[in-house]
């Protein structure tokens, strides 16, 4: 009986555990949901949004040449997996005043996969 209780507690406690990330799946989700506004890779250009190369560790509102909203510039966010996860689910709620008019991505796997894909790229667009 004690073993079952421990197993159930371990199972319930792991609900917030990180999902396996699939960069190839993330590329497809990014192409479908993000590429109308964002670019990534060696030839990435500014579109409606900034390129997403080298996002891990970059301060929000700092991609050179992109006209960010005051909300982005003053957000104090440094992008990492946790900040991205929270923001991408509801950008306009997480950063009131952002120009990113996007309802967000609710699917946990899609969010994890997009991060895995983006995290492959250095600031200049080459893969790590």
Report residues per predicted region.
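Extracytoplasmic/secreted proteins, especially bacterial periplasmic and envelope-associated proteins
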Residues: 25-29, 47, 51, 83, ...
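Positively charged n-region of N-terminal signal peptides that target proteins for export
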Residues: 1-4
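C-terminal capping alpha-helices of c-type cytochrome domains
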Residues: 78-128
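Sequence/structural segment immediately N-terminal to covalent heme-attachment motifs in c-type
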Residues: 21-44, 52
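Residues at helix-coil transition
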Residues: 31, 39, 57, 89, ...
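Electron-transfer interface patches adjacent to heme c in soluble/periplasmic c-type cytochromes
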Residues: 39-43, 54-83, 101-112
């Amino acid at each position: 009986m004690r073993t079952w209780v421990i197993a159930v507690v371990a199972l319930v406690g792991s609900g917030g555990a990180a999902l396996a990330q699939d960069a190839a799946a993330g590329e497809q989700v990014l192409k479908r949901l993000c590429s109308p506004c964002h670019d990534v890779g060696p030839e990435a250009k500014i579109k409606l949004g900034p390129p997403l190369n080298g996002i891990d560790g970059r301060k929000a509102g700092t991609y050179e040449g992109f006209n960010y909203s005051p909300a982005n510039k003053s957000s104090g966010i440094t992008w990492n997996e946790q900040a991205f996860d929270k923001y991408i689910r509801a950008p306009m709620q997480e950063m009131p005043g952002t120009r990113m008019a996007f309802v967000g991505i609710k699917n946990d796997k899609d969010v994890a996969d997009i991060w895995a894909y983006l995290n492959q790229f250095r600031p200049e667009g080459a893969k790590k």
